[in-house]
A protein has these predicted regions:
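Bacterial N-terminal signal peptides that target proteins for export
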Residues: 2-15
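Bacterial N-terminal signal peptides
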Residues: 13-24
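Signal peptide processing junction and immediate N-terminal pro/mature segment
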Residues: 24-31
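Gly/Pro-enriched, hydrophobic low-complexity segments
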Residues: 31-34, 38, 58-60, 108-109, ...
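Flexible, processing/modification-adjacent segments and terminal tails
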Residues: 31-39, 67, 71, 110-174, ...
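N-terminal mature ectodomain segment of secretory-pathway/periplasmic proteins
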Residues: 34-116, 197
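A short, polar/proline- and glycine-enriched secondary-structure boundary/capping micro-motif
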Residues: 66, 98-102, 111, 119-122, ...
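C-terminal low-complexity, charged extensions that often adopt amphipathic alpha-helices
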Residues: 251-255
Length: 267
C-alpha cells in the first residue's frame, strides 16, 4: 500500500524473531523434574559403578575481557581412570600441552611443551585428588563432578530449579537433555539414552559473573571395563625433562588454564 514503509528482514533477524516468540509463548519445557532427577541419578549410578573408564574430550573455557568481549579457549584431551585411586589425563590447547598422572600416591603435572614436571604426594582416592587439584593447584579435571563417588548428591545439593528439555543429539548420539539452576551457577547436561547412560556434553554457566562465562566439555569415544585395556598410571620422565617445585610451576608461562598473555582481572 502506498505510503507504508517496506520492511526487509535478514535471515538472522527472522530467526531471532522466531526464537524470541518461542521463548515468550511456549509453556515451561517438558518440566518433569522427578523424571529428570531419576535419569540423572541413573547416569551417576552407572558411571560410578564403572571401575575403569576412558574417553576423549573437547572443551571450551569462556573468558570475558574487561571490555566485555567473550573469548573461548578451546582444548582437547583424554582421560583414563581406574577406581579408586588412579587417573591419567592430557590437555592440549595450543598454548599448553599438559599431562596429569596420579598413581594413588604421587601426583605428577607434566608440561610437554616445556619438558618440565612437578611431583607432590597426594595419597588418597580420586575424590581427594579432585579436591586437591581444584583448591591447591587451580587445575580442575575435565568433567570431574560427574566421576566422583557421590556425584549425584554433590551436583544437585544446591539445585533450586530443574528442567527436562526432552532430547538432543550430540556427536550423532540421541541424548536426554536436562537443565539445572543453583545460586550463581546454571548447568546443562546431555545423557545418552538406554541401559548404559553416560554424559555426552556438560555446560556450566557462571551466572554470578557479569556476562555469564561458560565452560563446556563434550565427551566422545567412551570406553569402560575391558574396553579400556591396561593404561599405565606411572610417570616416566622423558629424556631431558627437568623437575621443578610446585611454587616454580606457578610461575612458568603457558602451563596453566590461561595463555600467558591473559591476566585475571583484565585482558
Amino acid at each position: 500500500m502506498a505510503g507504508q514503509p517496506k520492511l526487509k528482514l535478514s535471515a538472522a533477524s527472522a530467526l531471532l524473531l522466531v526464537l524470541t516468540a518461542w521463548m515468550v509463548s511456549s509453556p515451561p519445557a517438558v518440566a518433569d523434574e522427578a523424571q529428570a532427577r531419576t535419569l540423572l541419578k541413573a547416569m551417576t549410578d552407572y558411571v560410578g559403578a564403572q571401575q575403569s573408564i576412558a574417553f576423549d574430550y573437547d572443551a571450551t573455557l569462556e573468558v570475558v575481557t574487561k571490555d566485555r568481549q567473550k573469548l573461548q579457549l578451546a582444548s582437547s584431551g583424554t582421560v583414563s581412570l581406574a577406581r579408586p585411586d588412579k587417573i591419567r589425563t592430557t590437555r592440549s590447547g595450543g598454548f599448553v600441552d599438559m599431562e596429569t598422572v596420579f598413581d594413588g600416591k604421587t601426583l605428577t603435572l607434566f608440561g610437554k611443551n616445556k619438558n618440565l614436571y612437578t611431583q607432590v604426594e597426594v595419597p588418597g582416592s580420586l575424590d581427594n585428588l579432585v579436591n586437591e587439584l581444584q583448591k591447591k593447584f587451580d587445575r580442575p579435571l575435565p568433567a570431574a563432578d560427574l566421576f566422583i563417588t557421590h556425584s549425584y548428591d554433590e551436583i544437585t545439593a544446591a539445585v533450586t530449579n530443574v528442567k527436562d528439555l526432552g532430547s538432543g543429539v550430540v556427536g550423532g548420539i540421541e541424548c536426554d537433555y536436562f537443565a539445572f539452576r543453583a545460586k550463581d551457577v546454571d548447568w546443562q547436561i546431555w545423557v545418552t539414552q538406554g541401559a548404559k547412560p553416560r554424559p555426552c556434553r556438560y555446560v556450566i554457566t557462571s551466572t554470578g559473573i557479569t556476562d555469564g562465562p561458560q565452560y563446556t566439555v563434550q565427551l566422545r569415544n567412551w570406553k569402560t571395563g575391558s574396553e579400556v585395556g591396561t593404561p599405565d598410571f606411572t610417570f616416566k620422565p622423558p629424556s631431558g625433562a627437568k623437575q621443578i617445585g610446585v611454587d616454580e610451576l606457578k610461575k612458568v608461562k603457558d602451563m596453566g588454564e590461561l595463555p600467558s598473555n591473559f591476566t585475571l582481572g583484565g585482558k
